[in-house]
């Protein structure tokens, strides 16, 4: 299982939000590139980046810093946040981003997702943000009536290989992940599942690894030193 340290970027700073609320911002570092180097130097295999301004349709604010990370860090990065059209996908991939994460358009335009998957294959990842089993869109501001497991199956059908699944009610709350939903997705699909939201302790990491998930994104717990990155990384490399 891959541990993805999360770098959430808002106004060119590394921050964390609580439950996706933009008025609950905690700034951890002024320079996200510095943070990317930190995780790389600690042995990260992959870095997960979210453009929070992009998620709220404030485009271009963090473009340069994301390009700087892609060009300076020689490990793969995946980037999401407000990616809703072909041009944005193309510009991120041209900027050196390894995988692009699509969010709201998976609900709003499944045909476009299929087109992008046909063109970019495994470089396209879909992020499913859910609350009480229903998919949330537009930077978590709107909860739809689409069932998250049903969406997972539809995505698998059109060729998506990897998803990031976030339980919004758990994100940034340090309460532990929603293990049940990960188990169901793993059981009912063959998608590579990256768990996100609420990974709080080394016990959570052990449990997710035991479920044979593809990866886990950890943000707040790393920055608040609830989880030691190297310990989590070692744990995930055991038995592989």
From Swiss-Prot:
Organism: Clostridioides difficile (strain 630) (Peptoclostridium difficile)
Single GO molecular function: 1-(5-phosphoribosyl)-5-[(5-phosphoribosylamino)methylideneamino]imidazole-4-carboxamide isomerase activity
Major place of residence: cytoplasm
Any Gene Ontology biological process: L-tryptophan biosynthetic process
Reaction it catalyzes: 1-(5-phospho-beta-D-ribosyl)-5-[(5-phospho-beta-D-ribosylamino)methylideneamino]imidazole-4-carboxamide = 5-[(5-phospho-1-deoxy-D-ribulos-1-ylimino)methylamino]-1-(5-phospho-beta-D-ribosyl)imidazole-4-carboxamide
Gene Ontology terms: cellular component: cytoplasm
Protein name: 1-(5-phosphoribosyl)-5-[(5-phosphoribosylamino)methylideneamino] imidazole-4-carboxamide isomerase
Amino-acid biosynthesis is among the record's keywords: yes
Pfam families named among the record's database cross-references: His_biosynth
Listed HAMAP family: HisA
Enzyme class: isomerase
Recorded metabolic or biological pathway in which this protein acts: Amino-acid biosynthesis; L-histidine biosynthesis; L-histidine from 5-phospho-alpha-D-ribose 1-diphosphate: step 4/9
E.C. code: 5.3.1.16
Residues of the active site: 8, 129
Keyword Cytoplasm attached: yes
Origin superkingdom: Bacteria
InterPro entries in UniProt: Aldolase_TIM, His_biosynth, HisA_bact_arch, Isoase_HisA-like, Isoase_HisA-like_bact, RibuloseP-bd_barrel
Subcellular location: Cytoplasm
Gene this chain is encoded by: hisA
UniProt similarity note: Belongs to the HisA/HisF family.
């Amino acid at each position: 299982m891959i541990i993805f340290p999360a770098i959430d970027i808002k106004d060119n700073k590394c921050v964390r939000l609580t439950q996706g609320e933009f008025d609950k911002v905690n700034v951890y570092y002024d320079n996200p590139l510095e943070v990317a180097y930190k995780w790389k130097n600690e042995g990260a295999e992959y870095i997960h980046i979210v453009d929070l301004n992009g998620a709220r349709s404030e485009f271009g604010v963090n473009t340069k810093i994301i390009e700087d990370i892609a060009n300076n860090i020689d490990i793969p990065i995946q980037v999401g946040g407000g990616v809703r059209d072909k041009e944005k996908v193309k510009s991120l991939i041209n900027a050196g981003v390894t995988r692009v994460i699509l969010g709201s358009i998976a609900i709003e335009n499944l045909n476009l997702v299929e087109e992008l998957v046909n063109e970019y294959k495994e470089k396209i990842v879909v992020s499913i943000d859910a609350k009480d089993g229903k998919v949330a869109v537009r930077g978590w501001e709107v909860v739809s009536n689409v069932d998250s497991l049903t969406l997972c199956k539809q995505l698998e059908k059109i060729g998506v290989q990897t998803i990031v699944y976030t339980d919004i009610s758990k994100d940034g709350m340090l309460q532990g992940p929603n293990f049940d939903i990960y188990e169901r997705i793993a059981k009912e699909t063959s998608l590579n599942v990256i768990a996100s939201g609420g990974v709080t302790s080394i016990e959570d990491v052990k449990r997710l690894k035991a479920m044979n998930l593809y990866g886990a994104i950890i943000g707040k717990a790393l920055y608040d030193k609830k989880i030691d990155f190297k310990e989590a990384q070692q744990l995930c490399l055991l038995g592989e």
